[in-house]
Amino acid sequence: MDILLVDGYNMIGAWPQLKDLKANSFEEARDVLIQKMAEYQSYTGNRVIVVFDAHLVKGLEKKQTNHRVEVIFTKENETADERIEKLAQALNNIATQIHVATSDYTEQWAIFGQGALRKSARELLREVETIERRIERRVRKITSEKPAGKIALSEEVLKTFEKWRRGDLD
């Protein structure tokens, strides 16, 4: 099984759409990222865990599941990088391949040492955009292949039905 660990605020700061949303609302940017990760998870079958720094919030770590994506807000004084390193170490085994999405160069080297593979923010964005295009194409194809609203009938059958409609039952 593949597991993707995502440095949430790193993606928000690197993806143009999310960066624009962040200017108005961090919460909206987080929600859109989680939604995109849910689509990614659904399409790839990979488990996805998005980690956000507690970001000036005091207290304990908070975990939640949103659209079947695991979301972790780190505890006070713990960075997303630190939490991702711990998760990568804890989840890594012979049956699991860990991927870490971050553009933080130091974090990339740290996770390499634990056997995890890295994806930059740009690589993950491209992958997500490719998946979105594939989903759109598939939806268009399925929609266009819907059966026609009418059943093709021969001219003779149409004439018979028209007679019946007019009450001529002979």
From Swiss-Prot:
Lineage top rank: taxon: Bacteria
InterPro entries: YacP-like
Pfam families the UniProt entry points to: NYN_YacP
Annotated protein name in UniProt: Uncharacterized protein YacP
Organism this protein belongs to: Bacillus subtilis (strain 168)
